[in-house]
């Protein structure tokens, strides 16, 4: 952590207005105030809330929307451009799943100076999600997983200063005092250091009556490992908590009662819960706030707060538990709705894991309060409020309800398996057991604890259990970096970027280039190349290099930074040689059809299944390619048919396919973040591939692959197979062009073969199969009738061979028919105690429970075999055929039967 630069924080408003800088005796932080009698920093837990039931200021908003608009308008009037909110899923980043603050919108591309900001200065109100405090939600009175961070940002580039610390603090003070009507001496500025997303800087936490309402960060460090390096860009990064400001202005007992008041009232009616005593609620919120950050030591916290309030701790727990559950339902339902609306499908991996975590917590709390309504009713009730503030949720409302309903069904199924799962765990259940039960089966630890208690096993559930889970899954796992070659960046550091002829003309299959470097005898760097290097799910081109009358095969092509390296098999050219390049044109065209076909197929899937569909992975290859997409169930045959028809309509429409380089900001503003279907694209410019144009534009994506120039050149898109490969991910296997034709011809060949075997024409196969199935069913019914007669005959013979051993009836019988259903029915009608059936080298033992089948199997194994089983059934094999008399005699001699 860098040392706080005190001189930076001595702003002109503090000096000019006579603010006093003091050190808090409780937490040690310095703070600035106009209040001469203030003796602490003004933050929790150093001071209690002073606004509950007594809101500060003169401004009384009618709704939370009024506060948001007041903030944005305030900064618009002061030269800031209003910017629309970004999605809560950070598709433009590969280091985090979710947007946790407004600055996430501009990291890393703007903060690193790769691209300019969308406006400068700007103001925004960004929905954000943080699960670091998920276990505190509902308990502390102020924590949320989803919140809106209102902000104003300024990006100060070298030679182009916008504004810095003085103006930022003045804006904050003016907003809180003039716009909201707070007294000057009620606004405290606490010094601190902020760090996040690879950047850091000094900051002020803006506090009013015990609550932090905003953070003003002056970002000028880049964090690299343990080092803090000065950035060329100095960034004003502010965050004003919309919900917290609204809470303070209403003076409600908790942030939930302020923000979700309408929903909570409806939910209490729906669930049959009484409205709590606001005085007790207010007192509880004040005291729980002051116990923070130790608030998670719940047992001690409730006892301590109960003492302070003057009631019994058990009475307090009975009072707070239903309210805590309601607050969790309110917060989590909004957060999950935001996530699903922005394309998240609840699952057991990736960002979907985090959505499922919140839904499972809601279901757990529904269980705690004994709710008898489905979770979808909670969501439906809340969504009817949320769509007034977030109208975009209206379009996603049915999808949200469908996914929540599906998640509840999966949860109930998992819970039904709990007794069996717990029985497999020997001894005490550890935290790792609880984590594994949640990660593998989605069972909340509190439910595990209750089930374990029935078995006399005590389970301790950490109060921060869900925070532990979220921390394990909050970032994407880092894949292997670099290339597969024995070539490093140092090997090519002295070389210029390779000219990429494959982008200039994707139909250039031949060309000439100059050799710039030969590395280790087989890695060739040219000044330009028509060979496409592997990337974006598209394999590298193959072909040959010809020079000096010889030829070398190009077997692989990879990027090493901006340089393209060709791997050859054969003679090696010399530096300075001019080589003739020739790629396998048929293979390249096949891959181009597959890549353009992937874009068309993905867009067709989205149009049929819904806008929540995102690409989860792709591999373009020949003769088959795959496309993985996010979706919550396997598509129906009719949906697959519609997808294929839609894709081929685009092929037949002969739409143009064009690629162009665009500034990242311009592309995002024009097309939205949907351009990142294929993942994060680095750099200040992105290559946009557009299928169609004008009103006929079908698909737009950022893509670095090679594409056809018109859709008709694909010829045909044929979906071969559709599978669910994991929860929330569907895989489409497809083919295009001549490979699609080959696939159809192969199917026709199989159809002709079936027709020949059925002795019918190709168009009569379906009816012939129906007739065959009917005949087979009739034959099976006749077989069952005959089997029943055979069983009667076999039983008569078995009973004749029955012997008595230790008072029990035992029969050993050689059976020519080894059909499981037949044997089971035969055994069920056997009137004795032990039945041994032998077929060749195999045996089966059936008993009525008086004798253990496994004991009989152990005896039979002495004849040279192996087998095992349970109390009433066993099976095994003999190493060699055995005689019936040997089996009978062995049983008589060695089997000890006990009742």
From Swiss-Prot:
Keywords associated with the record: Aminoacyl-tRNA synthetase, ATP-binding, Cytoplasm, Ligase, Metal-binding, Nucleotide-binding, Protein biosynthesis, RNA-binding, tRNA-binding, Zinc
Keyword Ubl conjugation (UniProt): no
Coiled coil: none
GO biological process, one term: alanyl-tRNA aminoacylation
Superkingdom: Archaea
Pfam families, per database record: tRNA-synt_2c, tRNA_SAD
Similarity annotation: Belongs to the class-II aminoacyl-tRNA synthetase family.
Protein name from the UniProt record: Alanine--tRNA ligase
Species this protein is from: Caldivirga maquilingensis (strain ATCC 700844 / DSM 13496 / JCM 10307 / IC-167)
Gene field: alaS
């Amino acid at each position: 952590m860098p040392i706080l630069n005190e001189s930076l924080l001595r702003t002109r408003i503090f000096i000019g207005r006579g603010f006093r800088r003091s050190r808090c005796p409780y937490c040690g932080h310095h703070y600035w105030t106009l209040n001469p009698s203030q003796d602490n920093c003004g933050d929790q837990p150093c001071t209690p809330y002073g606004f509950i039931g007594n809101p500060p200021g003169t401004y009384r908003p009618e709704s939370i929307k009024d506060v948001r608009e007041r903030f944005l308008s305030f900064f618009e009037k002061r030269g800031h451009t209003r910017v629309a909110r970004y999605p809560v899923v950070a598709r433009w980043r590969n280091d985090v799943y979710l947007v946790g603050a407004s600055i996430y919108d501009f990291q890393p591309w703007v903060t690193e100076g790769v691209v300019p900001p969308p406006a400068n200065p700007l103001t925004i109100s960004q929905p954000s999600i943080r699960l670091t405090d998920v276990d505190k939600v509902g308990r502390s009175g102020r924590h949320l997983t989803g919140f809106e961070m209102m902000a104003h940002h300024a990006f100060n580039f070298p030679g182009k200063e916008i504004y810095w610390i003085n103006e930022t603090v003045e804006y904050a003070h003016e907003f809180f005092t003039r716009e909201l009507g707070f007294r000057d001496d009620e606004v405290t500025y606490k010094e601190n250091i902020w760090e996040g997303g690879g950047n850091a800087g000094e900051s002020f936490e803006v506090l009013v009556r015990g609550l932090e309402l905003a953070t003003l960060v002056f970002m000028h460090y880049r964090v690299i490992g343990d080092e803090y390096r000065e950035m060329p860009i100095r960034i004003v990064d502010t965050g004003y908590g919309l919900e917290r400001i609204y809470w303070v202005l209403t003076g409600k007992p908790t942030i939930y009662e302020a923000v979700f008041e309408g929903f909570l009232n409806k939910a209490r009616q729906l669930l049959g819960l009484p409205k709590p005593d606001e005085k007790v609620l207010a007192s509880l919120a004040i005291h729980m706030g002051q116990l923070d950050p130790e608030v998670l030591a719940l047992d001690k916290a409730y006892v301590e707060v109960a003492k302070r309030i003057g009631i019994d701790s058990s009475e307090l727990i009975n009072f707070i538990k239903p309210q805590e559950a309601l607050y969790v339902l309110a917060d989590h339902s909004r957060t999950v709705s935001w996530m699903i609306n922005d394309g998240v499908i609840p699952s057991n991996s990736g960002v979907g894991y985090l959505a499922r975590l919140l839904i499972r917590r809601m279901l757990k709390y529904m269980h705690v309060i004994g709710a008898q309504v489905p979770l979808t009713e909670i969501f439906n009730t809340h969504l009817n409020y949320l769509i007034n503030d977030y109208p975009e949720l209206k379009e996603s409302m049915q999808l949200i309800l469908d996914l929540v309903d599906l998640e509840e069904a999966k949860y109930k199924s998992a819970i039904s398996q709990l007794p069996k799962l717990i029985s497999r765990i020997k001894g005490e259940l550890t935290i790792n057991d609880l984590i594994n039960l949640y990660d593998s089966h989605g069972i909340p630890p509190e439910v595990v604890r209750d089930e374990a208690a029935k078995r006399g096993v005590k389970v301790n559930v950490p109060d921060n259990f869900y925070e532990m889970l979220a921390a394990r899954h909050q970032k994407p796992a880092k894949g292997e970096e670099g290339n597969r070659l024995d070539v490093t960046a140092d090997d090519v550091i002295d070389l210029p970027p390779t000219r990429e002829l494959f982008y200039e003309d994707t139909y250039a299959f031949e060309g000439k280039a100059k050799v710039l470097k030969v590395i280790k005898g087989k890695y060739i760097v040219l000044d330009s190349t028509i060979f496409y290097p592997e990337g974006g799910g598209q394999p590298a081109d193959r072909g040959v290099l010809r020079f000096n009358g010889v030829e070398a095969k190009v077997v692989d092509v990879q990027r090493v930074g901006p340089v393209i390296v060709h791997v050859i098999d054969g003679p090696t050219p010399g530096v300075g040689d001019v080589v003739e390049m020739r790629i396998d044109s048929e293979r390249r065209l096949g891959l181009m059809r597959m890549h353009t076909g992937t874009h068309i197929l993905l867009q067709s899937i989205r149009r049929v299944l819904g806008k929540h569909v995102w690409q989860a992975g792709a591999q373009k290859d020949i003769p088959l390619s795959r496309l993985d997409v996010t979706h919550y169930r396997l598509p129906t045959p009719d949906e697959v048919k519609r997808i294929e028809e839609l894709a081929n309509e685009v092929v037949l429409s002969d739409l143009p396919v064009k690629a162009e380089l665009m500034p990242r900001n311009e592309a995002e503003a024009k097309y939205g973040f949907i351009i990142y279907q294929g993942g994060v694209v680095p750099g200040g410019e992105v290559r946009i591939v557009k299928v169609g144009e004008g009103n006929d534009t079908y698909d737009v994506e950022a893509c670095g692959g090679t594409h056809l120039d018109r859709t008709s050149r694909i010829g045909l898109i044929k979906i071969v197979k559709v599978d669910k490969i994991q929860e929330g991910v569907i895989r489409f296997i497809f083919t295009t062009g001549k490979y699609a034709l080959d696939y159809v011809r192969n199917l026709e060949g199989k159809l002709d073969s079936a027709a020949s075997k059925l002795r019918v024409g190709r168009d009569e196969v379906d009816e012939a199969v129906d007739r065959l199935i009917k005949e087979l069913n009739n034959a099976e019914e006749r077989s069952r009738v005959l089997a029943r007669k055979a069983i009667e005959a076999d039983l008569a013979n078995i009973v004749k061979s029955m012997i008595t051993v230790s008072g029990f009836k035992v029969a050993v019988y050689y059976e020519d028919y080894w059909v499981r259903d037949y044997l089971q029915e035969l055994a069920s009608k056997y009137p004795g105690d032990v039945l041994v059936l032998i077929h060749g080298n195999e045996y089966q033992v059936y008993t009525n429970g008086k004798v253990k089948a496994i004991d009989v199997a152990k005896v039979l194994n002495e004849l040279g075999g192996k087998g095992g089983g349970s109390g009433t059934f066993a099976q095994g094999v003999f190493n060699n055929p055995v005689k019936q008399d040997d089996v009978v005699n062995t049983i008589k001699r060695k089997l000890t039967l006990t009742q």
